């Protein structure tokens, strides 16, 4: 369960930095 949350946060950070 925790891994899914971490993956989602990482994806959000990547999308923000790409933005």
UniProtKB/Swiss-Prot annotation:
GO biological process, one term: programmed cell death
Disruption phenotype: None seen. An isbC overproducing strain cannot be made in the absence of the sibC gene.
Positions of transmembrane segments: none
Pfam families xrefs: Ibs_toxin
Keyword Transcription: no
UniProt keyword terms in alphabetical order: Toxin-antitoxin system
Coiled-coil intervals: none
Induction summary: The sibC sRNA prevents the toxic effects of IbsC overproduction, either by destabilizing the transcript and/or preventing its translation. Expression of the proteinaceous toxin is controlled by antisense sRNA SibC.
Extra remark: Part of the SIBc repeat region (formerly known as QUAD1c), encoded on the opposite strand from the sibC (formerly known as rygC) RNA.
Family label: Belongs to the Ibs toxic protein family.
Biological role: Toxic component of a type I toxin-antitoxin (TA) system. Overexpression causes cessation of growth and rapid membrane depolarization. Overexpression induces stress-response, the psp phage shock and a number of membrane protein genes.
Protein name per its UniProtKB record: Small toxic protein IbsC
Lineage: Bacteria, Pseudomonadati, Pseudomonadota, Gammaproteobacteria, Enterobacterales
Gene name per UniProt: ibsC
